[in-house]
Amino acid sequence: MPPLDRADPGPDAVLNDETRYWRENGYLKLPNFFPHEVLDAYVEDCVAQGIAPHGWSDPCPFTHQPLMRDIACYRPLMDKIEMLIGTPMGLNLALTGWRSTTRTWHQDDYLNPPYINCHYAAVWIALEDIDPDCGMFEFVPGSHKWPLTRGAKIQSLLPSETRFEPDWPVQAEKIITGLLDRKIEESGIPIKSFQARKGDALIWHGRLAHRGSIPKNKELERRSLIAHYSAIVKRKDLPRLKRHRDQGWYFLLENSKED
């Protein structure tokens, strides 16, 4: 596990106000973190390409979208994530739609190979001021300390004919949601929303319970970029890496389209 997830983080762990907060709560807000001109260039490019508001269907469009990498591989962001996880990280997934995912309660790490073991983080980046009626990102502080339901355990609860299908995570959503609904109710921990302004970001732990809430106004866009990162030394299944200029690293999947 990452040093900050251990009972004793050890002598090499960075302990400051931010890492202590992360250790306790499982997330870290970064107010006004991104230069607006970098965000604007990406937004304008999305509109020009006709990608907005649905986003790319490709889960790794960053391999061929340098303006997205300017944001998701932004060096100060990569440095923050490395500080929290304790090892260099690489970008491995991006969700690019400008509507709420409406994905119900889940933890990210159950979808990872078990050897990742929390060496994982994700970031919610606001490309504009976010209207609270658009379906906000919600999370449960401290839920990263709850026991993780491993993917193999969830798969074992699925019918044998769907257990190993590529879309098994979709089939498992009802199970995961039910487990976390009960846990949240039992814990009594208040649910928090990330009401972000343009340039704000929120980093969250791979085990933090979170969801994309149902929008009150489905016509509203939620202009954001959601990026996921894995420890470079842990991703034995993703051996190809590339660096974005002098910024951060990103993984190349087999048959990745490149710019």
Set out the residue ranges of the language-model regions:
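Double-stranded beta-helix
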Residues: 133-209
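Non-heme Fe(II)/2-oxoglutarate
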Residues: 1-7, 17, 153-157, 198-203, ...
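Short edge-strand/loop segments of extracellular domains
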Residues: 99, 140-148, 228-234
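Non-heme Fe(II)-dependent double-stranded beta-helix
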Residues: 1-116, 248-258
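Short, conserved beta-strand element in jelly-roll/cupin
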Residues: 115-132, 195-198, 203, 228-233
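A short beta-loop-beta micro-motif enriched in histidine and acidic residues
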Residues: 76-77, 109-120, 189-190, 196, ...
